[in-house]
Amino acid sequence: MTRSPITKPIAAMKIVAFGDSLTVGESELGSDPEEYASYPGYLEFLAQRHLGKHRSDVKVSVVNRGVCGDLTSGMLRRFSRDVVVEKPDYVIILGGTNDIGWLMDPAMIADNLSMIYDAALDAGIVPIACTVPSILGLDELIPPRSRLNRMIRTEAEKRSIASLDLFAATADSETNRLSEQYSADGLHLNMKGYRQIGQYIFDNWLRALLDKYAQ
């Protein structure tokens, strides 16, 4: 049986950003949007600014449910308490970076992510699948990322859910390495990198969704 989430006008939209340290970010350093050092905080700012330009009454909140060092198995275990209890409309799922660091099989990682997508659908939450960003300094860990990302896109297509290519958004197109301009330490992103992810998610998914409610 196909589960098709129903999209309808709403006065408030809640999004949970679910993942590991790439979701946690560095910290929220202040009220200045230029200082946002996590993609969820910057994404919320972009959404509210966009709606303000349309004079829309819709309110958007992006709840950060990242856990540093988490694996996809851990994300699966805590999905109910960290995501379902929030009763969000959408959940952005970004996981697998740490699994690859522990040399886990990309197919196993994809299985865990698939179960998270299904758990969201079963709870009436729309999942947004994200590919894993690249790395700088350990080229041998780029191919498993590419394999995992192909599986992520395939699993998203099977479920007719959106997928966002954060690898392409932050990688050097010539080397497939994490772009130096977005890298903090080769694995984690700097402030510019987290803002890039927030902007990419907004431009490639959230903007069009908000426009439906701002009319």
For each feature predicted by the language model, list its residue ranges.
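Short, solvent-exposed loop/turn segments at secondary-structure boundaries
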Residues: 28-33, 103-107, 139-143
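Alpha-helical structural signal in soluble globular domains
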Residues: 42-50, 82, 115, 119, ...
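Internal alpha/beta domain cores that form substrate/cofactor-binding pockets in large enzymes
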Residues: 16, 46, 56-86, 98-127
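Structural recognition of the beta-strand scaffold that forms the well-ordered cores
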Residues: 15-17, 23, 61-66, 90-94, ...
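Catalytic His-Asp segment of secreted/periplasmic serine-dependent ester chemistry enzymes
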Residues: 134-215
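Serine-esterase "nucleophile elbow" of acetyl-processing enzymes
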Residues: 1-65, 80-87
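Active-site segments of SGNH/GDSL-like serine hydrolases
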Residues: 94-98, 114-150, 173-174
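Solvent-exposed loop/turn segments at secondary-structure junctions
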Residues: 21-24, 67-72, 97-101, 133-137, ...
